Regions:
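HIT superfamily nucleotide-processing domains
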Residues: 1-151
Length: 151
């Protein structure tokens, strides 16, 4: 099921043609993408592959994979980025982004205090010159994909 005017559904409809940054890893129920508009390399988004707008809409099969994906991504981010920990956050409230998605954000040891905790969202919607480039996001995606075993 897809929804018109949904960015995530539009990307899913183009799945086979997506660049590495838009399909870091995936399975039948979930797709992992590198976040767009961020200045933080490795900021990932875990997306259900069908359109839902609330966590309670997950099927049991989707829910069963959710925790495993969050842990696997956190481990892979630690290996690839050297982060001390990861944040996992879900809102799905922004205009055009009501499709449920989980931010899996690497938190480096030297991240300034103003960007820790919920302040990390200050690293999204950055000016173009501050954003992780598509090429860099693709490189990170490939490294994470290799760490995850192509899952």
């Amino acid at each position: 099921m897809t929804a018109p005017d949904c960015y995530t559904c539009a990307m899913e409809a183009e799945f086979d043609a997506l660049p590495p940054r838009e399909r870091v890893a995936y399975d039948r129920y979930w797709r992992v993408a590198h976040a767009t508009g961020t200045s933080l390399p490795g900021w990932l988004v875990l997306l259900p592959r069908r359109h839902i707008t609330a966590v309670h809409e997950l099927t049991d099969a989707e829910a069963a994979g959710l925790g495993a994906w969050q842990v696997r991504l956190s481990r892979a981010l630690r290996t690839v980025t050297g982060c001390e920990k990861t944040y996992v956050v879900q809102f799905a409230e922004a205009e055009g982004f009501a499709h449920v998605h989980f931010h899996v954000v690497p938190r480096a040891g030297d991240l300034p205090s103003e960007y820790r905790g919920p302040g990390v969202f200050g690293l999204l919607r950055r000016p173009a010159e501050q954003q992780v480039t598509e090429g860099r996001a693709d490189d990170i995606a490939r490294a994470l994909g290799a760490e995850l075993g192509g899952a």
